[in-house]
């Protein structure tokens, strides 16, 4: 678990949620540096959450952010399982419907930004609704 200094000078451990939020901010900044535009963060729909929604040109990009300290057990990208992909697809489907769209009418893709140790990996179009 990550630590941050406090006003008293002694480090305080971050919760899992705080650590995840911090890496999502890093991913957002990194993607913005690559030219993507921010749309939303931590989008919750029935049964799931999408970490980031970005735009690249006319494409809506649903982003899953993952962090692992090391690649000992496969690294961050390997942690996006088929079950997680299914939840992300369902959540995106609901979000699109709420915004008067669907996979048939909106150009979209699913990316993974994986932080493993000090390395960042951007997997564009990591999976889709036909996977």
Curated annotation (Swiss-Prot):
Segments of this protein annotated with the region Disordered: 1-20
GO molecular function: nucleic acid binding
Compositionally biased intervals (Polar residues): 1-19
InterPro entries, per the entry: Restrct_endonuc-II-like (IPR011335), tRNA_endonuc-like_dom_sf (IPR011856), UPF0102_YraN-like (IPR003509)
Similarity remark: Belongs to the UPF0102 family.
HAMAP family: UPF0102
Protein name: UPF0102 protein YraN
Organism: Escherichia coli (strain 55989 / EAEC)
Taxon lineage: Bacteria, Pseudomonadati, Pseudomonadota, Gammaproteobacteria, Enterobacterales
Gene symbol of the encoding locus: yraN
């Amino acid at each position: 678990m990550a630590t941050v200094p406090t006003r008293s000078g002694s480090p305080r451990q971050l919760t899992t949620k705080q650590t995840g939020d911090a890496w999502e901010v890093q991913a957002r900044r990194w993607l913005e540096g690559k030219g993507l535009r921010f749309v939303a963060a931590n989008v919750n729909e029935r049964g799931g959450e999408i970490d980031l929604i970005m735009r690249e040109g006319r494409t809506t990009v649903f982003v899953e952010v993952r962090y692992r300290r090391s690649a000992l057990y496969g690294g961050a990208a390997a942690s996006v399982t088929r079950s997680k992909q299914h939840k992300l697809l369902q959540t995106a489907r609901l979000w699109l419907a709420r915004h008067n769209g669907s996979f048939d009418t909106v150009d979209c893709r699913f990316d993974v930004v994986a932080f493993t140790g000090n390395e960042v990996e951007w997997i564009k179009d990591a999976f889709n609704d036909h996977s």
